[in-house]
Amino acid sequence: MVVELQHSTFKNLKVFITGTSSGIGHAVSKAYLERGSIVYGIDNKNNKSLNLQFKNFEFHNCNVQNYKKMSLIVKKILKKSKSIDVLINCAGIIDFKSIEKSTIDFWKKIIDVNLTGTFISCKLIAPSMKKNKKGSIINVSSRAAKFGGLDETAYCASKFGVEGLSRSLYEECKKYNVFVNTITPGTPIKTSMSKKTYSDEKRKIWKDPYLISPAFLHL
């Protein structure tokens, strides 16, 4: 059951979300949009369903690790809207290779999206939140940040990094009334990424990502 929160709390809230074209990012975007928030979506693929369904959704096509383009997008948004109230980093990728088969390029690809991409969004948006003395940053973590997984050296390292980044940024931002949290989906969630990770047995119990959207709304 999805917990209902007062829609007035979210009306005209300005929310910046990465990875909005599918999975958790898409579901969380929809949850905010349904409650009247203005959502700025970032992804390198455009799922037009949100554009067609909600007038309060603004999509930007960009790879999260592209600092130059991300910087231009954030500057454009801040110039127009004056503030971003919530930052949610959902963009991520996963792949499996043994240490012998993990090339430097493979390592960089995982780290660049999952960790560097999260850092870039935080670097570009956190300063404006600190200046405005309010804000919420939510970074999507993983069980891989708690436990090592077979053939997941790059992915686990990227998610351990997200945890460390988030804890350090929390210490930096808390005196400015800016909150930094991570969310670790514990239940198997049905996403394009999880098709690679879950066995047929786990897929029998996996859940729609929309069901975890209240966790983001509460933060």
Predicted regions and their residues:
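Substrate-binding pocket helix/loop in short-chain dehydrogenase/reductase
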Residues: 98-99, 106-108
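Residue(s) in the substrate-gating loop at a strand-loop-helix junction
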Residues: 142
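C-terminal helical subdomain
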Residues: 175, 182, 200-219
